[in-house]
Regions:
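Nucleotidyltransferase catalytic core that binds NTPs
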Residues: 1-176
Length: 176
């Protein structure tokens, strides 16, 4: 059984920061695969700008041909908001170990996550740097030199931050 890094999120829209995180994860020699898993609906949000099926399609296009990256539709197929603990427990039936990847901006709310006490016992957290947020030494840290967020990108639609393979389609969806 393999060891994976679970990189979940809304990816609403996917951008160069997400790609940089995946590249950084692929360099970690103790991870066999990076599992990228879009949410059906983020548990902390009431809606997504782009529907889950479309976000899943974009991720498949972005990482097509990359043998270390697995695009997983588990959460999308649930047709509901899925908590991280539920996803991790599902993945542990298929993989030996799950590293859970989060952005440093999620650290402040981490303890409010559903069943966090259980979650922290079954995963090892990998935290991607973001802005100047301090990352506690108990977490594995990966350096990512991208400062964009999906919400900021929806506001400004900076084409240079969109993956080239699907940027036209992303622009069309978010401009409407």
């Amino acid at each position: 059984m393999k060891t994976i890094a679970l990189f979940g999120g809304s990816f609403d829209p996917p951008h160069t920061g997400h790609i940089a995180i995946v590249k950084a994860l692929k360099r970690l020699n103790y991870i066999d695969n990076v599992v990228v898993m879009p949410t059906y609906l983020n548990p902390f949000k009431s809606k997504s700008a782009a529907n889950a099926t479309l976000r899943l399609k974009w991720l498949k296009e972005i990482f097509r041909g990359d043998k270390k990256v697995i695009i997983d539709d588990f959460e999308v197929k649930q047709n509901r908001s899925v908590s991280t603990i539920e996803t991790v427990l599902h993945l542990l039936t298929h993989y030996k170990k799950v590293y859970l990847v989060i952005g440093a901006d999620n650290l402040a709310s981490l303890e409010r996550w559903n069943r966090f006490d259980e979650l922290k016992e079954i995963v090892t957290f990998i935290v991607a740097t973001r802005d100047e947020i301090e990352i506690d030494a108990r977490f594995i840290k990966i350096e990512v030199n991208e400062t964009i967020s999906s919400s900021a990108l929806r506001d400004v639609l900076d084409v240079s931050r969109l993956p080239s393979v699907c940027k036209d389609e992303i622009l069309k969806v978010y401009k409407d």
